[in-house]
Amino acid sequence: MSSTKNKGSDAEQQATIFLQQQQLTLLEKNYRCRFGEIDLIMQDGDTVVFVEVRMRVNQLFGGAAASITPAKQLKLTRAARHYLARCDEDFPCRFDAILISGNREIEWIQNAFDEG
C-alpha cells in the first residue's frame, strides 16, 4: 500500500473515531459504486450522513476544504443517491466534511454542501 493510501486510511480511521465520539454510528466505510466513492457513511439520529475526509499537510492550494471541488461534490451526491436507492425507506441526509490538518487537528463541517 502506498504512503498516500496509508495516510488516507489513517485519516479515515481518525475521522471515524472522532464522529463516533460525537454519537454518530458508522454504517459503511469506503462505499464504492459506478458514480464514485464515499469515505464514510454515518448515522446521526434518523439522518444518514455522507462524510468526505480530507487531510492536508500544508495549506498550499487552499487547504483541505478547497480540495472538495464542485466536480467532487457532484460525484459524492450521485454516489449518495445510489446508496439511498438501495434503502427501503426515505432517509433525510446531509453531506459533511472532516478536514484534518498536518498536526492532526480535526475540523468538522456539517452540511458542507448540498445536493445542489
From Swiss-Prot:
Family: Belongs to the UPF0102 family.
HAMAP family recorded: UPF0102
Provenance organism: Nitrosomonas eutropha (strain DSM 101675 / C91 / Nm57)
Source organism, top-level taxon: Bacteria
Lineage of the organism: Bacteria, Pseudomonadati, Pseudomonadota, Betaproteobacteria, Nitrosomonadales
Pfam families (UniProt xref): UPF0102 (PF02021)
One GO MF term: nucleic acid binding
UniProt name for this protein: UPF0102 protein Neut_1662
Xref: Gene3D superfamilies: 3.40.1350.10
InterPro entries found in the cross-reference section: Restrct_endonuc-II-like, tRNA_endonuc-like_dom_sf, UPF0102_YraN-like
